[in-house]
Amino acid sequence: MITTILIIFTILSILISIKIVPQGYHWTIERFGKYIETLNPGINFIIPFVDRIGHKINMMERVIDIPSQEIISKDNANVTIDAICFIQITNANNAAYRVSNLEIAIINLTMTNMRTVLGNMELDEMLSQRDNINIQLLNIVDEATKPWGVKITRVEIKDIRPPAELIESMNAQMKAERTKRADILEAEGIRQAAILKAEGEKQSQILKAEGEKQSQILKAEGERQSEFLKSEAKERDSEAEAYSTKIISDAISSGNMNSIKYFIAKKYTNAIKELGSSNSSKVIMLPLNTGDLFSSIISMSELIKSDKNVFKK
């Protein structure tokens, strides 16, 4: 009977002494109420009936929700703040025996420092510098929780809610700002369109003026060429007249009356032709002695037939 009791006691003692710690946890061992050691994940053995499990500490990173609270900003705006805190225990002994309730302590510490940090900022800074706020809170809370064996990995501001009337005012301000930007963009578009139109008209006027300039140049060049040709024609006529005069002079010197009659008859007929073809002529010119005219023409014919050397010269 006693042997059976001893066997049962021994088996029970062995079972009680075996402790299997799950992954991600550390267990503290107390002996007569005093901390002795920390059990790591896996199979561990303790002294039965003397040692006991003190605290089962979760060593994994976890999230603590920070309750919302109202904070008065530097510019006296009542703002409601929500936040979360990411923690990881690095020392199970300190987390179990240096603070009575670790989670509540971290919540109160975070809320206190949120009031301190955000209370020194204006509302616009709170809304625009959320990353800086997170960094400041992380540094402060992490430093304060080091003696507790806790590592603060992140502190995040979830929401910043100004009062309802202030939100309405901000919405009206943003709407006015968007309207202002839209008006500015529209005015800028109109200005650019006017500039492009004026530039196009300017280029058109330049091209038109350039075309007129080229036209005037070509016209002047044409007139110059025409005057040059007229001058050359007059010069040739003058040379021909001088040559004819020379021939007549030579004929007079040599006593050739046929050449003289030819020259006079030619001048006479040309003058009659010009007077007759003029549009403003109102007087009909007739020779005084038609017989002399006919005789001159006959003389011209005879002269042409008999004396071709005159024209060859």
UniProtKB/Swiss-Prot annotation:
Keyword Transcription: no
GO cellular component: a single term: plasma membrane
UniProt keyword list: Cell membrane, Membrane, Plasmid, Transmembrane, Transmembrane helix
Localization in the cell: Cell membrane
Domain of life, per lineage: Bacteria
SMART domains noted in UniProt: PHB
InterPro entries per UniProt: Band7/mec-2_domain, Band_7, Band_7/SPFH_dom_sf, Band_7/stomatin-like_CS, Stomatin_HflK_fam
Protein's membrane topology: Single-pass membrane protein
Keyword Disulfide bond: no
Major location (coarse): membrane
PANTHER family attached to this UniProt entry: STOMATIN-LIKE PROTEIN 2, MITOCHONDRIAL
Family: Belongs to the band 7/mec-2 family.
Protein name per the record: Protein QmcA
Species of the source: Wigglesworthia glossinidia brevipalpis
Lineage: Bacteria, Pseudomonadati, Pseudomonadota, Gammaproteobacteria, Enterobacterales
